[in-house]
Amino acid sequence: MSLETASTPHTTRPEPSRRFSVAPMMDWTDRHCRFFLRLLSRQTLLYTEMVTTGALLHNDAHRFLRHDASEHPLALQLGGSVPADLAACARLAEEAGYDEVNLNVGCPSDRVQNNMIGACLMAHPALVADCVKAMRDAVSTPVTVKHRIGINGRDSYAELSDFVGQVREAGCRSFTVHARIAILEGLSPKENREIPPLRYDIAAQLKRDFPDLEIVLNGGIKTLDECQAHLETFDGVMLGREAYHNPYLLAEVDQQLFGSDAPVVSRSEALAQLRPYIVAHMESGGAMHHVTRHILGLAQGFKGARRFRQLLSADIHKAAEPLAVFDQAVELLQGR
């Protein structure tokens, strides 16, 4: 596998297409998950988990930035609010070969709020603008923002428009809009993905009012048919948990959303391509479940799906030969 690291010389890449992307998801979109998803779609833009500026600047940056060359197009999502720190991290991302740097202005968790990260920054548009400008001044890699449509106490359209307008003035040209407000007190991150109502109409108003900006819609999208419908209004769509729990949805993204004439990869073909990656990971001292935990949804809707999940989530931990257990699971999806 060809790994790119922070020491890999940066080569200029074209601006990535954001027509279809998989959202940054904590504990889920690690490098193993992204390698697997890339086997299903060549065109999808993939995002890392959010990485804080502190993690990159005060720990082993290589551990957070390393990725396989096949993962491109690939964006790094940063969490932070100190412009100089974000600029330094953007430089690390550019040196490591990332295709985009994205600032998290959408995460509602208490833990990140306490560090001035995530959705709480929607109350500070001038600071977000300063952060974006610092990153743009530091790198040629595209800098984007992912945000909510508001936060409790600051949820009017006028305030959202002011936020986008100020950040646009700092040079940001692409905004990914999670079409819910974030409730910063009293709701868990999970509840913040479910309880505040989806307001696609507000995101659509942003696109009408800022026609020069790229507006990518996120939140509650579950099918490629829905993606097609939203693409009549928006420049791109981003899927989160649906893409993780039902990853085979990605297998037809290239054909349906990008017009590719490449054959659709089967589930068993994707797993056959994943096997050498698993072997290499284990030979380097890693555990099989680091990879296989991300593929449990691949059998969704098939007879034998429960057995598939059991083999890969429980039986591999007890097996003397975990690769043999993986092969058993693959057999359940042969020809599918």
Swiss-Prot record:
Catalytic activity entry: 5,6-dihydrouridine(20) in tRNA + NADP(+) = uridine(20) in tRNA + NADPH + H(+); 5,6-dihydrouridine(20) in tRNA + NAD(+) = uridine(20) in tRNA + NADH + H(+); 5,6-dihydrouridine(20a) in tRNA + NADP(+) = uridine(20a) in tRNA + NADPH + H(+); 5,6-dihydrouridine(20a) in tRNA + NAD(+) = uridine(20a) in tRNA + NADH + H(+)
MF annotations from Gene Ontology: flavin adenine dinucleotide binding; FMN binding; tRNA binding; tRNA-dihydrouridine20 synthase activity; tRNA-dihydrouridine20a synthase activity
Interacts with tRNA, annotated site positions: N104, K190, R193, R306, R309
Active site, per annotation: C107
EC number per UniProt: 1.3.1.-, 1.3.1.91
Pfam name, any one: Dus
Residues involved in FMN binding: P24, M25, M26, Q77, K146, H178, N218, G219, G220, G240, R241
Gene3D superfamilies: 1.20.120.1460, Aldolase class I (3.20.20.70)
EC primary class: oxidoreductase
Cofactor: FMN
Domain of life: Bacteria
UniProt keyword annotations, A-Z: Flavoprotein, FMN, NADP, Oxidoreductase, RNA-binding, tRNA processing, tRNA-binding
Function: Catalyzes the synthesis of 5,6-dihydrouridine (D), a modified base found in the D-loop of most tRNAs, via the reduction of the C5-C6 double bond in target uridines. Specifically modifies U20 and U20a in tRNAs.
Family of this protein: Belongs to the Dus family. DusA subfamily.
Name this polypeptide is given: tRNA-dihydrouridine(20/20a) synthase
